[in-house]
Amino acid sequence: MSSSTLLHLLLLSSLLFSCLANVEDEFSYIEGNPNGPENWGNLKPEWETCGKGMEQSPIQLRDNRVIFDQTLGRLRRNYRAVDARLRNSGHDVLVEFKGNAGSLSINRVAYQLKRIHFHSPSEHEMNGERFDLEAQLVHESQDQKRAVVSILFIFGRADPFLSDLEDFIKQFSSSQKNEINAGVVDPNQLQIDDSAYYRYMGSFTAPPCTEGISWTVMRKVATVSPRQVLLLKQAVNENAINNARPLQPTNFRSVFYFEQLKSKVCAI
């Protein structure tokens, strides 16, 4: 190989690396940075909602500020195992389903499960407490409406869903790959206890911060091992090691709460 050809390849590699870095650094989770969360709305015209939107997520969820609504009922979901890929966006690790991974029904509208994002620490807080991890299951209806189901985690036993994906997640930190085929992935492995949950209207938690998102946040906390969270953190860039957006104002929004009532057994 001639020296000029080698130089050309080095320049191309440098340019490619620079482009990838720029994509990853479009926004940061580090408060005080020029591209930090308080400035997202000023970085691009199409991200203006991040700064000016009135229904932004995440928010603080407090039991003493909710509207109890028993008509919500248990979640009507029907998930199925299907081929999926893992993608490293630089800001988070996500699972993207290639086929029909099943659906969630809200107000008689079917929302197809599309992808799952992971954020550590959690983005939502519950009664003043922030948790070690949050999984966000993004769903989409035929008319492009979106609904997100959120699971909060504390350190404890390993999460079975992430356990099946650990070997794939490791590859992100040991190679330059940003997309990996994960084979068949079963969303039913997720620890979803829908006997109690919060619901409110909000937004996506990363630019462009699109509003009109129906959020359902599980009240019961699941468990994840510290090692599993570490693997997720090692995969992303340094601006997203703690990839949780700061809490946003509730702005007079209603937060509804469902809890399944325990049946009472009467002695005769």
From Swiss-Prot:
Tissue localization of expression: Expressed in tuber (at protein level).
What does UniProt say on post-translational modification here?
Answer: Not glycosylated.
Q: Which UniProt keywords apply?
A: Allergen, Antioxidant, Disulfide bond, Lyase, Oxidoreductase, Signal, Storage protein
Q: Where is the Alpha-carbonic anhydrase domain?
A: 25-259
Entry-linked SMART domains = Carb_anhydrase (SM01057)
Q: Which InterPro entries match?
A: Alpha_CA_prokaryot-like, CA_dom, CA_dom_sf, Carbonic_anhydrase_a-class
Coiled-coil positions:
none
Q: What does the record give as EC number?
A: 1.6.5.4, 4.2.1.1
UniProt-annotated binding residues for L-ascorbate: D92, H117, F118, H119, Q136, T205, A206
- SUPFAM superfamilies recorded for this chain? Carbonic anhydrase
Primary role? Storage protein of tuber. Involved in protection against oxidative stress. Has carbonate dehydratase and weak trypsin inhibitor activity detected by measuring the dehydration of sodium bicarbonate and the inhibition of trypsin-catalyzed hydrolysis of N-benzoyl-L-arginine-4-nitro anilide, respectively. Contrarily, no carbonate dehydratase or trypsin inhibitor activity detected by measuring the hydrolysis of 4-nitrophenyl acetate or the inhibition of bovine trypsin-catalyzed hydrolysis of N-benzoyl-L-arginine ethyl ester, respectively.
Q: Which PANTHER family match?
A: CARBONIC ANHYDRASE (PTHR18952), OS08G0470200 PROTEIN (PTHR18952:SF253)
Q: Which family does the record assign?
A: Belongs to the alpha-class carbonic anhydrase family.
- Name under which the protein is recorded: Dioscorin DB3S
Species of origin: Dioscorea polystachya
Gene designation? DB3S
